[in-house]
């Protein structure tokens, strides 16, 4: 991917994100609108994405890494969207030897049977401490999930790095608030049943012993 001189390269953004504690911003090109404070940046979640992708890729096995104490290449930022609350980082490791997986697209430049390890990082909803959780992508497909269409995986592979450096919270999606509602319902039912058992006992025992006494 070629970058114009006025736009920071992917390597520059990734190195800044790996060396700064919060958000590494570099000046954007001349603004077209009146807002002169907009910057291009890579959020701190990108660092965790690279670490997560490297470690998980090492579990499944990879090729192309140097051994003997030589440090492996750093992960490359593929896409960062702080407004949407996620960052995509491609790990330098490759997952190889999985014959049942589809062949990688030609534009990725990988050999047959080798796939890029891409980590998607999403910050914990409501957390201001930037403690993200991540999931590994193998050529646009979540492990254990149906494959994402090639058009979507191409967007992830060729996406532009950099996004507006804005502090924003993430709204919990259905995959998060539905389990939370189920847990809250189970807890409320248990508490209600315990209170009923405690109140119906002949001799009101001291709390919380009444939780384990049934009425006679």
From Swiss-Prot:
It comes from Homo sapiens (Human). Expressed only in testis. GO terms for cellular component: cytoplasm; membrane. It is a single-pass membrane protein. This is Putative transmembrane protein RNF32-DT. It is found in: Cytoplasm; Membrane. It comes from the Eukaryota. The keyword Magnesium does not apply. The chain crosses the membrane at residues 177-197. The keyword Transmembrane applies. Keywords: Cytoplasm, Membrane, Transmembrane, Transmembrane helix. Its main location: cytoplasm.
């Amino acid at each position: 991917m070629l970058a114009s001189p006025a736009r920071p390269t992917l390597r520059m953004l990734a190195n800044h994100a790996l060396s700064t504690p919060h958000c590494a911003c570099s000046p954007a090109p001349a603004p077209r609108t009146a807002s002169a404070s907009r910057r291009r940046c890579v959020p701190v979640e990108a660092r965790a994405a690279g670490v997560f992708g490297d470690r998980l890729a090492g579990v499944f096995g990879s090729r192309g890494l140097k051994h003997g104490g030589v440090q492996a290449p750093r992960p490359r930022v593929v896409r960062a969207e702080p407004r949407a609350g996620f960052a995509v980082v491609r790990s330098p490791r490759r997952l190889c030897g999985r014959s049942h997986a589809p062949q990688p697209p030609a534009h990725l430049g990988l050999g047959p049977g080798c796939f890029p390890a891409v980590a998607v990082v999403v910050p914990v909803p409501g957390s201001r401490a930037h403690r993200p959780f991540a999931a590994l992508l193998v050529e646009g497909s979540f492990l254990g999930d149906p494959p994402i269409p090639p058009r979507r995986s191409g967007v992830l592979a060729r996406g532009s790095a950099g996004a507006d450096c804005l502090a924003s919270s993430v709204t919990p999606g259905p995959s998060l608030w539905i389990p939370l509602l189920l847990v809250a319902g189970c807890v409320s039912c248990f508490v209600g049943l315990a209170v009923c058992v405690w109140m119906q006992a002949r001799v009101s025992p001291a709390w919380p012993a009444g939780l384990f006494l049934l009425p006679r």
